[in-house]
């Protein structure tokens, strides 16, 4: 990859340099997703069978995975992998449990009590991709916080393999996390099924999970139409690395490739004030690429990625906050000393021995993160993502006497007479 000198770019060129490859959804993709959603809305299970046969190449009589199939999944997964999944799930639970939101109660004035109650979303839908690779880790990342939140019903959709079955490790993850129902459905059609409901698939209140451009577009369209709530815009994976001259080139190359291998639409960026470091990373990339089973996919992603030379690390953080990466790696001598400069990122990885892959799997943080610049306004999935916050207030007779005058003044200033009257009647001062 060519090294770009940030200081040599004008404003337009700088903006172009930070443009994501999948930032603009092609018109044909948008129209295709709209058609798929409408087909599922009108045709239900029949439409799902037709679409699954068309895109996945399998004819399914039923979509739901049986209890027996879920139980059998454990025997199909190697003991070593089972143990790793159980260990990862425990760490994910420990981190997410520590950050859970609690009810609270405050007396805001004498005789006036305000509360916030935390309640689980009744039925949630989880989407677990299985396109270029079945991401059973995503089932852990979504299933654990859903269980901690107390959701009554957790529905999981994942694409079928060529034999019509779901990946055994995905099924095991679903079982480990207490998912209540699993369906072998993928793509935009799975999102539409969870949003509208069919004879087989229940209607969900909120849909979670990453996916390809079709999945992301389906989530966006259905959310914008008010059909279903979604977690966040979650598209192609991305990583931005800020490195100084002391960083390890081999480590950085490995981290860049771990994102690039996700798919050809992934993006990786390296920002550094050291030409020598970036040249060394380029050499390490070439060497490590030769050893990857998904080298061709990684090469396609690297083709639209960027190495950016900055004059100072302060500039690197300004660029990073503007880009708002899904993953931000600080390969710096004192990474924690720079953490206060981070204003927008999905998840941050500090130092040489915190590869992004740890967060993907088993450090405990969630890997379902905002992409495409959404980290400027969205956060990664947490237990709160699966909950509603309900406010409650109670005023006694003395309480309304205490604060009623304030409400009257504000209501009358806004010209809302009925609001004012509702307060005045209770204060015994209605005209």
From Swiss-Prot:
Its cofactor is Zn(2+). Binds 1 zinc ion per subunit. It comes from the Bacteria. It catalyses: L-histidinol + 2 NAD(+) + H2O = L-histidine + 2 NADH + 3 H(+). PROSITE patterns: HISOL_DEHYDROGENASE. It comes from Xylella fastidiosa (strain Temecula1 / ATCC 700964). One of its GO terms (molecular function) is histidinol dehydrogenase activity. Pathway: Amino-acid biosynthesis; L-histidine biosynthesis; L-histidine from 5-phospho-alpha-D-ribose 1-diphosphate: step 9/9. One of its GO terms (biological process) is L-histidine biosynthetic process. One of its GO terms (cellular component) is cytosol. The active site is at 326 (proton acceptor), 327 (proton acceptor). Zn(2+) binds at residues 259, 262, 360, 419. Catalyzes the sequential NAD-dependent oxidations of L-histidinol to L-histidinaldehyde and then to L-histidine. NAD(+) binds at residues 127, 189, 212. Keywords: Amino-acid biosynthesis, Histidine biosynthesis, Metal-binding, NAD, Oxidoreductase, Zinc. InterPro entries: Ald_DH/histidinol_DH (IPR016161), Histidinol_DH_CS (IPR001692), Histidinol_DH_monofunct (IPR022695), Hstdl_DH (IPR012131). Its EC number is 1.1.1.23. The lineage of its organism: Bacteria, Pseudomonadati, Pseudomonadota, Gammaproteobacteria, Lysobacterales. Pfam families: Histidinol_dh (PF00815). This is Histidinol dehydrogenase.
